[in-house]
From Swiss-Prot:
Responsible for synthesis of pseudouridine from uracil-2457 in 23S ribosomal RNA. Gene3D superfamilies: Alpha-L RNA-binding motif, Pseudouridine synthase I, catalytic domain, N-terminal subdomain. One of its GO terms (molecular function) is 23S rRNA pseudouridine(2457) synthase activity. This is Ribosomal large subunit pseudouridine synthase E.
């Protein structure tokens, strides 16, 4: 009886060890397979009111309705109420290069604001403003004409007839939550429409709103 119990325990331990070896081996194999995949980079011109993800439990519009490509994920966020360039990739190193603050990758935005910013307001944006999560890095900020490539937004923005609007070109080197909107509001000119045009070396470059294309890294 004693021999039977010892034999049974030994069999159980051996089986558990074999299970561990197989599980860890499978994990390494999956990781190697992922690392050996060729890099894919998708550029998408995100419309207004689309989430920068492929699923949503509440039924809102997602990337799945536009991009039939599996295994790629957005590098950084572009809020539901913002438009423009979204870079998706399966390469973690590329995602980090585009989004990590220490990389200081430039991101260009065209921003329609309420009112016409003064030179003092532009200088404040360039030098950095102090938000509730700390001071921002110096940024590029200039008053520009409405972009010639601009597409109509659906629905249109709500403008007040008594207040003019203007366009800014803003370049950030960090990526905080809703940073552009908070910066323009801080200097007294609320954002009405926000379009990301470029991230690092990637740009919209005549990509139509709601369309995507694959590029080489």
């Amino acid at each position: 009886m004693r021999q039977f119990i010892i034999s049974e325990n030994t069999m159980q331990k051996t089986s558990f060890r074999n299970h561990q070896v197989k599980r860890f081996s499978s994990q390494r194999s999956t990781r190697r397979k992922h690392e050996n995949q060729p890099t894919r980079v998708i550029l998408f011109n995100k419309p207004y009111d689309v989430l920068p993800q492929f699923t949503d439990e509440t039924g809102r519009k997602t990337l799945k309705e536009f991009i039939p490509v599996q295994g790629v994920y957005a590098a950084g966020r572009l809020d539901r109420d913002s438009e423009g360039l979204l870079v998706l990739t399966n390469n973690g190193a590329l995602q980090a290069r585009l989004t990590q603050p220490g990389k200081r990758t430039g991101k260009i935005y065209y921003v329609q604001v309420e009112g016409i910013p003064t030179q003092d307001a532009l200088e404040a944006l360039r030098n950095g403003v102090t938000l509730n999560d700390g001071p921002t890095l110096p940024a590029g900020a200039e008053l520009v004409d409405e972009p010639a490539w601009l597409w109509p937004r659906n629905p249109p923005i709500r403008e007040r007839k008594s207040i003019p609007t203007s366009w800014l070109k803003i370049t950030l080197y960090e990526g905080r939550n809703r940073q552009v909107r908070r910066m323009t509001a801080h200097v007294g000119f609320p954002t009405l429409r926000l379009i990301r045009y470029a991230m690092g070396d990637y740009s919209l470059d005549n990509l139509a709103n709601g369309e995507w294309r694959e590029v080489t890294d």
